[in-house]
């Protein structure tokens, strides 16, 4: 009986309290008596003592005084301001929920289910303030791959077992349907999966295509019909440029838009008001120097194609200064764009 009382106390406090919404012992006793009218104050007091003595394990705490005078004649001890230290703060849950809510590749119906599960991790006060109507107002017109979570499960299992996978890789057509990139719709690419990462709202598989010796990455929401092959995964140290192992953090820092190519040292000059945007893109992996006259010099190490797209998007704020071949590529892209717009006006 005592063991079940401990569970009931934790359950009630977890559902109804947090540090900002504590509960009095007498209110806790009232909740318990809805299930067992015979339970008494002393039994509850002793059980709370047990839980509070192991607060690091039970997550049960109390604030304020340990005695609550209900009347001049009542000198019995009561705990006040009891609460359960929730595993997630409201801010942490909101951050997780918004990440799912605005994800561009999670099927709409799955968002509803996942967010419902996340809401259950909070107490009644959190759920009262977190309206599920918000998700149902979102448009359901994002093109989706219904196999996304199946893909994640299978890839995760393959990585745990150290096995290769086979997968059909697709592109999205103008009708928002997926079509295999190869003429043979049943052709499965043989891949060595190493990690799954999120970038720019999309989930990527960092992998190696088995008949090559370099690292690459595929959009997981563009993959279909994934199967686990009964073949051991290729050791990452066998890949070009990864003989010392695979540092996923380093890989992500050098692939800002998950483009293809080897990181290259690139220098550019930028308006100093662009510094916040540069930091948003490159994080701490940019080196700033010689900030004067409203300009700053910058150095990054990213694939040239990545930098090409970024520089074109920000051509009014940044000027690439090296390498020369990247400058030539940017000039060519700008000339081509200018020719198109000039032709439109003539």
Where does each model-flagged region fall?
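Residue-level recognition of well-ordered beta-strand positions that form the cores
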Residues: 12, 23, 168-170, 267-271, ...
């Amino acid at each position: 009986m005592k063991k079940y009382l401990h569970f009931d106390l934790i359950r009630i406090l977890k559902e109804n309290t947090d540090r900002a919404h504590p509960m009095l012992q007498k209110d806790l006793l009232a909740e318990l008596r809805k299930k067992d009218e015979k339970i008494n104050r002393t039994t509850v007091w002793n059980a709370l003592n047990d839980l509070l003595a192991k607060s690091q394990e039970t997550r049960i705490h109390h604030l304020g005084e340990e005695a609550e005078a209900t009347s001049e004649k009542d000198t019995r001890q009561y705990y006040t301001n009891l609460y359960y230290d929730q595993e997630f703060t409201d801010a942490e849950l909101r951050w997780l929920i918004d990440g799912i809510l605005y994800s561009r590749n999670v099927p709409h119906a799955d968002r509803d289910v996942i967010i419902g599960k996340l809401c259950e991790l909070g107490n009644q006060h959190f759920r009262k303030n977190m309206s599920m109507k918000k998700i149902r107002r979102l448009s359901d017109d994002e093109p989706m791959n219904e196999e996304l979570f199946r893909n994640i499960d299978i890839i995760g299992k393959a990585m745990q077992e150290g096995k290769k996978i086979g997968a059909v890789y697709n592109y999205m057509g103008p009708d928002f349907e997926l079509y295999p990139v190869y003429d043979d719709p049943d052709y499965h690419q043989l891949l060595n999966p190493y990690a799954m990462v999120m970038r720019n709202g999309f989930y990527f598989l960092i992998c190696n295509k088995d008949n090559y010796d370099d690292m690459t990455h595929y959009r997981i929401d563009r993959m279909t019909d994934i199967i686990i092959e009964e073949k051991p995964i290729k050791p990452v140290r066998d890949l070009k440029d990864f003989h010392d192992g695979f540092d996923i953090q380093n890989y992500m820092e050098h692939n800002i838009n998950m483009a293809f190519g080897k990181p290259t040292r690139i220098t550019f000059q930028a308006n100093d008001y662009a510094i916040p945007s540069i930091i948003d893109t490159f994080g701490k992996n940019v080196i700033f120097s010689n900030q004067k006259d409203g300009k700053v010099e910058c150095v990054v190490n990213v694939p040239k194609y990545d930098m090409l797209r970024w520089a074109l998007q920000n051509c009014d704020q940044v000027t690439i200064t090296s390498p020369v071949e990247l400058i030539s590529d940017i000039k060519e892209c700008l000339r081509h764009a200018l020719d198109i717009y000039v032709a439109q006006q003539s």
